[in-house]
């Protein structure tokens, strides 16, 4: 009887593991080619995960809190170049490739311009391995890299000829237990 009670108590305390889906375009994108959030959103829904990445609870919480603290902006250009789509439970957003501008999905499905903290943008790009798909000469142009530095685990993904370069990546970010 005692064992049954323990099993029941443990099952009542089980909780859903926190996770984020991060989908991004690999490498540099031509500035004249605009990718809208709705496009990233629809592609993300059709492909499988490439990897599951585990991060420590502190980094995960910083990312989660930063996503919740996104600030709407009024004067933002209509054309944008989103390179990353993030699903954090009930919140979806797209992130610009060169700075901290983002677009948050509203109830009607429209994306509205916002700003995410530099730290959160940096953590999203770093922990999802987005930076690994940028050559060093492009990496150093990133606003967050200039502020926080190149991540200690940065490894530029070199593609050998004639292998086709990876175009997109979808990762699941989870808390390391």
Residue ranges with predicted function:
Residues 1-5:
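Sec-dependent signal peptide recognition
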Residues 9-11:
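C-terminal motif of bacterial Sec signal peptides marking the signal peptidase cleavage site
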Residues 13-177:
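Function-determining sites in protein domains
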């Amino acid at each position: 009887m005692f064992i049954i009670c323990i099993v029941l108590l443990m099952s009542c305390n089980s909780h859903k593991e926190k996770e984020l889906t991060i989908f991004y375009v690999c490498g540099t994108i031509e500035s004249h080619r605009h990718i809208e959030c709705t496009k990233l959103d629809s592609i993300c829904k059709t492909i499988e995960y490439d990897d599951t990445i585990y991060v420590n609870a502190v980094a995960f919480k910083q990312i989660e809190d930063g996503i919740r603290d996104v600030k709407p902006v009024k004067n933002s250009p209509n054309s944008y170049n989103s390179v990353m789509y993030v699903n954090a439970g009930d919140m979806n957003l797209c992130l610009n490739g060169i700075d901290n501008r983002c677009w948050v999905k509203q109830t009607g499905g429209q994306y509205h311009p916002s700003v995410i903290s530099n730290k959160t943008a940096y953590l999203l790009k770093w922990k999802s391995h987005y930076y690994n798909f940028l050559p060093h000469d492009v990496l150093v142009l990133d606003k967050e890299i200039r502020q926080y530095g190149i991540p200690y685990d940065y490894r530029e993904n070199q593609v050998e000829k004639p292998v086709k370069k990876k175009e997109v990546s979808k990762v699941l970010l989870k808390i390391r237990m």
